[in-house]
């Protein structure tokens, strides 16, 4: 019996039983209105309108097609004052009303100051008031129209100049002739040429003769002083601007005012003749001229490159480049000599105290042997010093046996004729091989060929 039943029919019966149970469990009460109907108790959360919920199709936020256009309500006449009521004219006006009427009827009298202001701002001549009183309203139209900013009237008076500046500018041109008469002819010619030439040609004049314009602040008086130096009269001079006091030689009238506020700064060579003719001790000062200080063209002379200082282990480049066979070297004698002390000149020691490094005279055995005679480019500490102010010349040679030989080339001496013998007596172990390269030295440069052995005491002890 159970096997013959159809499973589909059994499932349908189960679904029906469940639906019936659900209907029985539902509470008995007022049914909710359908979504299409309006309920004033509901409020939509989307649009905020009453009568429907947010899930209703009547909400315009979900369905714009169902949005209702607000209908215009009927015209309400009487609320708007389309025809305003005109005030009735009083039959017996009071004294106050009479005065007001007379003031309105009378044209407004404009004083001359208002007419001038109207003519200034608007740029139009003031119109004449009409007899019906309309001119009073039209004349005040310039107050309503936006106009440009008020012009700022500046006084035509010139600012006061400094009395000291005015006095100097007045006396500058008057006393220029007397100053030119008192100057030297060379300076007078340079002043006349600098004033007649253009700005470009004026810059090529002499550095010491050209008076450069300087200017003055209102407070202090910075003066520009050009001082030629004593140390370099032949090559070039270095001019340094300094803040100095007024000079006694040149008066204030010799200070021409600067036409250009900021002239270009140029650097030109300084001729030595001009500095000697004017005197090395003369100072040129240029006084105040205008408000802002002008940059005076400082005539920077040609500065020769300084010779680099050599350390104790540095080799000069000239010696490396010109290190040939038999090339002598100029060496300054040391301030104190070890072998010949009394013959040392104190003047030479004060002028150029030479810093001569020590040289390894005995080379190590690992080095390859050099040629028989070769000029050594390193300076050597000579044991003897030479009298006089002339430098010593020392020639270094490399021998075959690995030793170094040096020849001292000195100028003629007047009070020490026994010096060659003394040198030969002190160095008896000088090899004869080193005498041959001395012939290669030109006789015009060398006076004596004093050969001094430069081998150390260790090498002497090894030979013995």
UniProtKB/Swiss-Prot annotation:
It comes from the Eukaryota. Residues 1-42, 70-389, 411-437 are annotated as: Disordered. Residues 74-89, 97-114 have a biased composition (Basic and acidic residues). Residues 180-197 have a biased composition (Low complexity). PANTHER family: FAMILY WITH SEQUENCE SIMILARITY 90 MEMBER A11, PSEUDOGENE-RELATED, PROTEIN FAM90A1. Belongs to the FAM90 family. Primate-specific FAM90A gene family, thought to have arisen during multiple duplication and rearrangement events. This is Protein FAM90A12. It comes from Homo sapiens (Human).
């Amino acid at each position: 019996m159970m096997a013959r039943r159809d499973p589909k029919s059994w499932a349908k019966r189960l679904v029906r039983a469940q639906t019936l149970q659900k209907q029985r469990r539902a509470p008995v009460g007022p049914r909710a209105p359908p979504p299409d109907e309006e309920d004033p108790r509901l409020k939509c959360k989307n649009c905020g309108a009453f009568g429907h919920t947010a899930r209703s199709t009547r909400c315009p936020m979900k369905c714009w097609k169902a949005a209702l256009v607000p209908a215009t309500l009927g015209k309400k006449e009487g609320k708007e004052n389309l025809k305003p009521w005109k005030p009735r004219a009083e039959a017996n006006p009071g004294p106050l009303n009479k005065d007001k009427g007379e003031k309105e009827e009378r044209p407004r009298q404009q004083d001359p100051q208002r007419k001038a202001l109207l003519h200034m701002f608007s740029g139009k001549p003031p119109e004449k008031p009409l007899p019906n009183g309309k001119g009073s309203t039209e004349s005040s139209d310039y107050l309503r129209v936006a106009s440009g900013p008020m012009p700022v009237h500046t006084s035509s008076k010139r600012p006061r100049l400094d009395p000291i500046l005015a006095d100097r500018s007045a006396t500058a041109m008057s006393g220029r002739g007397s100053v030119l008469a008192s100057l030297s002819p060379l300076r007078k010619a340079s002043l006349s040429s600098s004033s007649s030439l253009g700005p470009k040609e004026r810059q090529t004049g002499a550095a010491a003769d050209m008076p450069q314009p300087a200017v003055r602040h209102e407070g202090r008086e910075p003066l520009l002083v050009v001082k030629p130096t004593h140390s370099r009269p032949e090559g070039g001079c270095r001019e340094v601007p300094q803040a100095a006091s007024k000079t006694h030689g040149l008066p204030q009238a010799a200070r021409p005012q600067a036409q250009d506020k900021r002239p270009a700064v140029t650097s030109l060579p300084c001729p030595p003749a001009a500095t000697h003719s004017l005197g090395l001790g003369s100072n040129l000062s240029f006084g105040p001229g205008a408000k802002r200080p002008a940059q005076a063209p400082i005539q920077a002379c040609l500065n020769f490159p300084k010779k680099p200082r050599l350390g104790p282990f540095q080799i000069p480049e000239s010696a490396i480049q010109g290190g040939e066979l038999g090339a002598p070297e100029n060496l300054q004698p040391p301030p104190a000599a070890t072998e010949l002390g009394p013959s040392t000149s104190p003047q030479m020691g004060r002028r150029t105290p030479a810093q001569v490094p020590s040289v390894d005279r005995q080379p190590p055995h690992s080095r390859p042997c050099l040629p028989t005679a070769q000029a050594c480019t390193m300076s050597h500490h000579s044991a003897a010093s030479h009298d006089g102010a002339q430098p010593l010349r020392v020639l270094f040679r490399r021998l075959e046996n690995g030793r170094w030989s040096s020849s001292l080339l000195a100028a003629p001496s007047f009070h020490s004729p026994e010096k060659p013998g003394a040198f030969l007596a002190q160095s008896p172990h000088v090899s004869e091989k080193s005498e041959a390269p001395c012939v290669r030295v030109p006789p015009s440069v060398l006076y004596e060929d004093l050969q001094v052995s430069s081998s150390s005491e260790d090498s002497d002890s090894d030979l013995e």
